């Protein structure tokens, strides 16, 4: 991660080298690092804001870490501090907004997977995986998304 927003190399090192047990409470730090890196690699000529989605419902809460614009729509970006993690909130957001593509930033390598959403009559959701160390490539990953 090439960040010029102060010396966060220690934080980055902790996230990238921690064990699974260490990562239990590092989700918010991973989200922060990804958000700062996304801002760092956006056009410097325009003021950018980061957006997220939260649904507050009785006895449940759902959130998507970042909502990024692409062409005439949006692409949700989910951040996971490890290689695994549930994505019920992401599926809910995609279902409600009728979206088929998303990005997951995690400790995984580049890749993609497809999810058959049985709650939406078997619609297929496509997720591109962006390693946390490569958040600078999110714009390129979005360009590879088929609309």
Predicted region positions:
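A cross-kingdom feature that marks ATP-driven nucleic-acid transaction machinery
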Residues: 1-147
């Amino acid at each position: 991660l090439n960040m010029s927003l102060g010396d966060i190399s220690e934080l980055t090192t902790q996230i990238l080298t921690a064990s699974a047990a260490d990562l239990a409470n590092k989700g918010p730090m991973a989200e922060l690092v990804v958000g700062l890196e996304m801002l760092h690699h956006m056009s410097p000529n325009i003021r950018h804001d980061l957006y997220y989605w939260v649904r507050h419902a009785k006895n449940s809460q759902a959130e998507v870490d970042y909502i990024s614009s692409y062409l005439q729509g949006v692409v949700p970006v989910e951040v996971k501090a490890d290689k695994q993690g549930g994505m019920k909130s992401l599926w809910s957001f995609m279902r409600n907004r009728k979206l088929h593509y998303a990005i997951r930033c995690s400790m995984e390598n580049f890749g993609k997977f497809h999810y058959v959403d049985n709650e939406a009559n078997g619609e297929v959701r496509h997720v591109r995986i962006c390693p946390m160390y490569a958040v600078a490539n999110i714009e390129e990953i979005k360009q590879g998304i088929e609309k």
